[in-house]
UniProtKB/Swiss-Prot annotation:
CDD domains: KOW_RPL26. Belongs to the universal ribosomal protein uL24 family. Part of the 50S ribosomal subunit. This is Large ribosomal subunit protein uL24. It comes from Burkholderia mallei (strain ATCC 23344).
Length: 102
């Protein structure tokens, strides 16, 4: 069970974007892509077959999953735990103990 899932609100805890918040767009094995975080400029060639014009565009790149933490109700970074409730595994915030929705 992944501790961070698509749609979770996270805060970056290390790196150049430290302190910024965003919503998780995609989760990989060890990386997460967060909306508006870790933007890089990508130079793109024009391609008439695809109908794209050339230029420089901003692209969101993945972060390592250890560099982000979930945000609790108070706006603070929180670690995530997993416990069994009613025979099912659920995620909960370690700072507040609040159970996260599936």
């Amino acid at each position: 069970m992944n501790k961070i899932r698509k749609g979770d609100e996270v805060i970056v805890i290390t790196g150049k974007d430290k302190g910024k918040r965003g919503v998780v767009l995609a989760v990989g094995a060890e990386h997460v892509t967060v909306e508006g975080i870790n933007l890089v400029k990508k130079h793109v060639k024009p391609n008439p077959m695809k109908g794209t014009t050339g230029g420089v565009e901003a692209k969101t790149m993945p972060l390592h999953i250890s560099n982000v933490a979930l945000v609790d109700a108070n706006g603070k970074a929180s670690r995530v735990g997993i416990k069994v409730e009613d025979g099912k595994k659920v995620r909960f915030l370690k700072t507040t103990g609040a159970v996260l929705s599936a």
